[in-house]
């Protein structure tokens, strides 16, 4: 049982619990016939709940700020509060196995997880005419289901040589299970929910589903085009689409989501006659990210203040009468819609990073003991060696969100990728 001062006293307390069990099957008598090849087999399961109150302070009351003008102080409205918000609850179920075979030359774990989130805490957007843009509310339920696999291999193991390989992967499916009626204010492609920023939160959809205009290329005179629904006399879509050069007339569509299909890491290490070498990679496959940095670098000048700004090299391939087949609109002073939000700037968020490389040598003990040293290792290491992504300069790991995990799906060029570091040293044990 826990309480949080971030909620109204009437909703401050929450009850959370957990229980788990494991069974080492290989210790049972009926498994005695497998001891020649099966070293360990464990079956495990757990279920429990935990609360989330990470929404900031005083979200349950209206807040105000002091403002100064011409030496006079006044009180101005800051944020809208909601006294009904309460704990977001995550109920986690995990079940899996751990195993080791062939003298643990092959070992690992396989685990299924099902995480259900109820009473999701999110900022709910409102009409600007209300005097505030959003307020926090418990907006619905969500599930994350998937599988985690961790495998370890030792192809070579001898007195002086050992080679290890490790691979891990995670696959998950995210879905909004339910939204209360007051949140189902809009229907998009058969899903009911609400729109906020560049996302649509709908029942049956992943949480971070992009909702924006679809880019349709350039017109014959080089202007940007967007798709637009054809409607009947009652204003209802007929299922057909046309194009328009007016951004405000373009229709919004579901454009994929930011959650990857697969992510994890892999690596290998080798030790031989005192030398050791290791290398590790991280990866992500699938998901989308909105590359706002690229959009800014492809914008056209809108004022004299644009003098001196730089562009991406792709701008050199923009439409011109001599280059009529380009998919990049013409450079036109004052065109403020060229880089407005659309799936033109959505990009595959897959990446591969060479996380670290290390190399070392451990001196023979018969040599170090002459100096009263039990063990001495000389090493050289490099961290954050390299990463590959769909576009040079784009690092999907550092998106515009609070946990820097790239989940929110919006690039943030104000956040630098980790710097590459090269280090070396000597480890001494007495």
Regions from the PLM with identified roles:
Residues 1-5, 25-27, 47-51, 103, ...:
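Transmembrane beta-strands of outer-membrane beta-barrel pores
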Residues 60-61, 68-107, 135-158, 204-207, ...:
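Outer-membrane beta-barrel signature, preferentially recognizing the C-terminal barrel domain
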Residues 26-41, 102-105, 156-163, 176-181, ...:
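Short loop/turn motifs that connect adjacent beta-strands in outer-membrane beta-barrel proteins
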Residues 4, 284-377, 382, 400:
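Extracytoplasmic gating/loop element in the C-terminal half of outer-membrane beta-barrel translocons
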Residues 139-144, 189-221, 316-318, 323, ...:
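C-terminal beta-signal and terminal closure region of outer-membrane beta-barrel proteins
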Residues 19-23, 95-99, 110, 149-153, ...:
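Residues on the lipid-exposed face of transmembrane beta-strands in outer-membrane beta-barrel proteins
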Residues 32-89, 107, 111-142, 195:
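Solvent-exposed loop/turn elements at secondary-structure boundaries
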Residues 137, 154-258, 298, 316-320, ...:
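Conserved small-residue
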């Amino acid at each position: 049982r826990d309480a949080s001062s971030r909620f109204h006293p009437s909703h401050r307390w929450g009850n959370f619990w957990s229980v788990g069990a494991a069974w080492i099957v290989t210790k049972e008598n009926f498994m005695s016939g497998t001891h020649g090849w099966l070293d360990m087999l464990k079956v495990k399961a757990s279920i429990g709940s935990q609360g989330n109150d990470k929404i900031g302070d005083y979200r349950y009351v209206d807040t105000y700020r002091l403002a100064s003008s011409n030496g006079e102080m006044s009180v101005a409205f800051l944020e809208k509060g909601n006294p009904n918000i309460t704990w977001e609850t995550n109920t986690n179920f995990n079940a899996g196995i751990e195993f080791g075979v062939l003298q643990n030359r092959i070992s690992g774990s396989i685990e299924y997880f099902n995480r259900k989130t109820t009473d999701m805490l999110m900022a709910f957007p409102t009409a600007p005419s209300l005097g505030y843009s959003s307020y926090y509310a418990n907006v619905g339920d969500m599930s994350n289901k998937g599988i985690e696999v961790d495998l370890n291999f030792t192809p070579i193991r001898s007195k002086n040589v050992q080679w290890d390989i490790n691979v891990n992967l995670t696959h998950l499916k995210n879905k909004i299970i339910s939204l209360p009626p007051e949140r189902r204010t809009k229907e998009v492609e058969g899903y009911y929910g609400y729109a906020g920023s560049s996302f649509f939160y709908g029942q049956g959809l992943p949480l971070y589903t992009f909702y924006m205009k679809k880019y349709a290329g350039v017109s014959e005179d080089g202007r940007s085009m967007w798709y637009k629904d054809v409607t009947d006399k009652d204003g209802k879509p007929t299922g057909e689409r046309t194009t328009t050069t007016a951004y405000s007339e373009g229709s919004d569509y579901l454009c994929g989501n930011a959650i990857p299909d697969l992510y994890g890491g892999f690596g290998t290490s080798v030790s031989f006659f005192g030398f050791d070498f290791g290398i590790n990679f991280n990866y992500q496959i699938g998901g989308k990210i909105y590359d706002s940095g690229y959009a800014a670098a492809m914008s056209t000048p809108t004022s004299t203040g644009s003098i001196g700004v730089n562009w991406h090299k792709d701008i050199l391939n923009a439409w011109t009468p001599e280059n009529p087949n380009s998919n990049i609109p013409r450079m036109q002073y004052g065109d403020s819609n060229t880089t407005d939000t659309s799936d033109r700037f959505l990009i595959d968020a897959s990446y591969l990073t060479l996380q670290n490389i290390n190399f070392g040598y451990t001196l023979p003990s018969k040599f170090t003991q002459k100096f009263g040293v039990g063990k001495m290792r000389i090493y050289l290491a490099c961290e954050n060696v390299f990463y590959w992504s769909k576009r040079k300069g784009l690092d999907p790991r550092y998106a515009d969100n609070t946990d820097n995990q790239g989940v929110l799906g919006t690039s943030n060029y104000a956040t630098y990728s980790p710097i590459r570091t090269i280090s070396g040293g000597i480890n001494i044990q007495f």
